Design a protein with these regions (language model features):
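Transmembrane helical core of 7TM receptor-like proteins
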Residues: 98-101
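Non-catalytic substrate-recognition and accessory regions of acyl/acetyltransferase enzymes
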Residues: 1-95, 106-205
Length: 205
């Protein structure tokens, strides 16, 4: 029985992280816009933290309403111990294409998103060397990608520390095999943006 204790503790820890994730989603207003078990995305209505001009000319100012895209962790393809390989990338790409079609249809019919001109998400990868490949994959889907600004204030750095730690916990809970041999300090982030016009043009019905 004692040999099973580490596994039992790990299982309990993962269940706790999943429960915590569900609670934080509710508090943050993150919701499921699709009932498709293959949908990889959740959505929230948020406000931009930055001024940005997207590649199609769409201009977003800090404070403007935006759609916040979040991964639906329970639906993500499982990674192996080597992380996201080619097979995983193909499955993710196809899943994202289908999910973005559903997103386009949803926001065109929900009045809450009538004034939203762009959609934003934060992407985390296990090491900085993975950023170019991940960025290229998302750009093929129509996203603009951008390195986040490094916070200068201690409060910003403190926030980033906890965001990275929580992201690591989520990976441990939902994609545990992918963390073998990886170090949390090597976690890298970047932003992805897509304008409403680009989303509807590419993925609209």
């Amino acid at each position: 029985m004692s040999r099973d204790k580490p596994g039992l503790l790990a299982g309990a820890g993962r269940r706790f992280i999943m429960l915590l994730d569900g609670l934080l989603r509710r508090v943050s207003g993150i919701f499921e816009f699709s009932g498709d078990p293959g949908c990889l995305l959740r959505l929230a209505l948020g406000r931009s933290r930055v001024d940005i001009v997207l590649s199609d000319g769409t201009t977003i100012h800090a404070g403007d309403p935006i759609g916040e895209i979040h991964l639906w962790n329970e639906h993500m393809p499982r990674m192996g111990s080597s992380g996201p390989d080619l097979t995983w990338g193909v499955r993710f790409y196809r899943g994202m294409m289908a999910s973005l079609k559903e997103l386009s249809n949803y926001v065109e019919t929900d009045h809450q998103f009538a004034s939203v001109k762009a959609f934003h998400g934060e992407v985390a990868v296990l090491q900085s060397e993975d950023v170019p490949a991940a960025s290229q994959l998302l750009e093929r889907l129509g996203f603009d990608t951008q390195a986040p600004k490094v916070p200068r204030s201690w409060l910003g750095r403190f926030r980033m520390f906890w965001e990275n730690l929580y992201t690591w916990w989520l990976m441990w809970a939902f994609q545990p095999a992918s963390l073998r041999g990886k170090n949390r300090r090597h976690l890298a982030r970047f932003d992805m943006w897509i304008s409403r016009a680009e989303l509807v043009t590419r993925y609209g019905a």
